[in-house]
């Protein structure tokens, strides 16, 4: 599927509107259409080089929209559901999640890694694979995100 997104192709500089391809969702993932995205100071810190990340990466971790497709194993979300994003793709199994501290989930290690929870990427453009900030990349028309980030 084709989409447009605001991409940081280098470690500093402007976000650039680019044409990308989105893969279908994998297990425990959903394909979403973002209707709204928030601009956060984190995005500005990325742009000016204050926060390290693995470019290229689609910006944005605050957004809302509509679920378009669900991957294998997703049972609590259906196509057509409206959602807002949660910045933490909590696992529900680590010691933090089991004590109600999902904001400290072990999955936090993936937030700026540029990969999905399985270590792969769902966005492609200019012959490269792209990551998404906080596994969300809300500065895109469509993206695949972890089902645990859909509220």
Per-region residue spans from a language model:
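Short structural boundary motif marking the start of a folded domain
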Residues: 1-6
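Short Gly/Pro-enriched turn/cap motifs at secondary-structure boundaries
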Residues: 21-22, 54-60, 130-135, 141-142
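Glycine-rich beta-strand-centered segment in the early N-terminal region that forms part
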Residues: 22-37, 47-98, 103, 111, ...
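Extracellular beta-rich ligand/substrate-recognition surface
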Residues: 7-14
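Residues that act as N-cap/strand-start positions at coil-to-secondary-structure junctions
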Residues: 14-17, 137
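Conserved Rossmann-like nucleotide-cofactor binding loop
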Residues: 40
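NAD(P)H dinucleotide-binding glycine-rich loop of Rossmann-like/cofactor-binding domains
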Residues: 93-151
């Amino acid at each position: 599927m084709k989409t447009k997104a605001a991409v940081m192709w280098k470690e500093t500089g402007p976000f650039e509107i680019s044409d990308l391809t989105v893969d279908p969702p994998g297990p425990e993932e959903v394909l979403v259409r973002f209707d709204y995205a928030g601009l956060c100071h984190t995005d500005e810190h990325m742009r000016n080089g204050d926060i390290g990340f693995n470019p290229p990466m689609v910006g944005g971790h605050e957004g809302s929209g509509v679920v378009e497709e669900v991957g294998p194993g997703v049972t609590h979300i259906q196509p057509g559901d409206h959602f807002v994003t949660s910045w933490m793709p909590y696992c529900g199994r680590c010691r933090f999640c089991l004590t109600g501290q999902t904001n400290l989930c072990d999955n936090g290690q993936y937030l700026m890694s540029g990969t999905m929870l399985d270590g792969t990427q769902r966005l492609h453009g200019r012959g490269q694979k792209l990551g998404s900030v906080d596994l969300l990349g809300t500065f895109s028309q469509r993206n695949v995100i972890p089902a645990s980030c859909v509220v």
